[in-house]
């Protein structure tokens, strides 16, 4: 469609309601048109000054005639008042995750499976579509009669969170669709941040003395999940759409759906249609070479069967469709100088060496810090302070130093030595025999206390909306909280005067803290931050014992009778509940009404029913997601390898668990092997 007529740069203000209504509609139409040209098509037709004049006139008219303000007006993108909590949204069509391929051979194997399942009669009709796998936050947009009525996060694929007001603030998300869309249409896509915007955002945070975000994905996800949509509106978010949920039946193919989305005024992921797998593989290779030139973060190429009818015939396994696969790129790497090694203290007292680097650009992100894991890792790799080193970054994984470049040494390099005293509290540290981690044993160490509060409020534990790291640090530094029990003694009037909060946000935070009392005991147990006790282990223990029983004294022998709880975990639990400081904390939490009752176990059956699996190393998706898949298939995830372990799922850098599995003869699976078990293509041995 052509551009609507531009107004005068200094327009007269309409005085009559009827005249104002007509002018408001004209302005909204013009602004939507130019939003599409600028944010979707990247082809602006007017100057910023001209656009600002349109916007100012609309603001002035809506101010004079507030009855003309509508939720889908361009002026309403600023966000509105904060929410008290996110409401759940059940996806009518599940937002499935994808199988992964890391080698070309795996793409060919997938192609062969697709052809085998479709049969020879479909050979001539089979087409593939490739599109970039953007590293952001997956969301869905529901339009009814062309108007945006709801936006939601992917969540677990079946239930997400309602983030409509947050997504409305994104300029590339239109409130109304062009052309003639179906009555119900649910485009799906990835919210992300361009690399240059990410760098600028972090630069400003550092100037204000705030901690920078680790990567663009974390910033995008955190921005959308802000209870206050005004915060979202200030973040430089954009979106690419890659598919359709509800309403997909209106299209014959994926490529047809993408073309329609573009016609409706939505930003569509760059994509190509292919006639065979060789062409797909060539395209993956081209993007692998070009990815560092892109202005957004990608971690692979998604390959999809184009025909909707063929997709339906292929179906899905567990949480992944058979008709799509993600080809993952190799991790990005850069070369820089290791200036220093500093030591940080975590919530369990673990001292972790961290590399201080000369800033280096890796995949469009400037990296100045990277993990060195532990003292043994540094020695095994032969890393010296002052070395030239190779740094890798894969997806949202923390950057890591993978090796030094010894040939570039000049003799001024120094060996790293782990400090003998905690760098925060000054107490002596120790490294237990057989462990790789040096620890501060002072339970009153401020660094441990703060990290414990941050962990307690996290989504996997008590999920306290609005209590992020920044606010937790501020409350801790002001002396308002010293441990997690103090959270339940906070009052809104204490919080409201704090910079960046205010009365409404303070009340919302207090409500969120109160709601955390409803979390089941396994979440509380995980939130306590006991060494070796992850979310899966906490669930196993909480199914057998209550908090009161653990306080009274449950022995190592009783705990190890729980399937999946080994001696190391059991001793850690017993030690935790034997320390008077911890017992006082648990008693206070009980007095505040938190849930310490046992959790009823869930009967499970599936292809991994009765099997015990351990996960180790870096995987292509979050470990919690892998655990969910295993447990959804009837399996149990445990934390340590023993003779009772049926499988070890090993990613990159698997560590000592892989050696232990080999010693005991435990079968080792990569992600593809696990996928075959989950899908039923292979039966457990």
From Swiss-Prot:
Domain (BRCT): residue spans on this chain: 603-685
Q: Where is the active site?
A: 133 (n6-amp-lysine intermediate)
Q: Which residues bind NAD(+)?
A: 48-52, 97-98, 131, 154, 190, 304, 328
Could you tell me the keywords of this UniProt record?
A: DNA damage, DNA repair, DNA replication, Ligase, Magnesium, Manganese, Metal-binding, NAD, Zinc
Which residue positions does the secretion signal occupy? none
Q: Matching InterPro entries, A to Z?
A: BRCT_dom, BRCT_dom_sf, DisA/LigA_HHH, DNA_ligase, DNA_ligase_AS, DNAligase_adenylation, DNAligase_N, Hlx-hairpin-Hlx_DNA-bd_motif
**Protein's UniProt keywords contain Ligase:** yes
Q: Name one GO cellular component term.
A: cytosol
EC number(s): the record gives 6.5.1.2
**What molecular functions are annotated in GO for this chain?**
DNA binding; DNA ligase (NAD+) activity; metal ion binding
The record's SMART domains line, in alphabetical order, gives: BRCT (SM00292), HhH1 (SM00278), LIGANc (SM00532)
Reactions it catalyzes: NAD(+) + (deoxyribonucleotide)n-3'-hydroxyl + 5'-phospho-(deoxyribonucleotide)m = (deoxyribonucleotide)n+m + AMP + beta-nicotinamide D-nucleotide
* Gene Ontology terms: biological process: DNA repair; DNA replication
Cofactor(s) required for function per UniProt = Mg(2+); Mn(2+)
Q: Where does Zn(2+) bind?
A: 422, 425, 440, 445
* Cited HAMAP family: DNA_ligase_A
* UniProt function note: DNA ligase that catalyzes the formation of phosphodiester linkages between 5'-phosphoryl and 3'-hydroxyl groups in double-stranded DNA using NAD as a coenzyme and as the energy source for the reaction. It is essential for DNA replication and repair of damaged DNA.
What family does this belong to?
Belongs to the NAD-dependent DNA ligase family. LigA subfamily.
Under what name is this protein listed? DNA ligase
Native organism is Rubrobacter xylanophilus (strain DSM 9941 / JCM 11954 / NBRC 16129 / PRD-1)
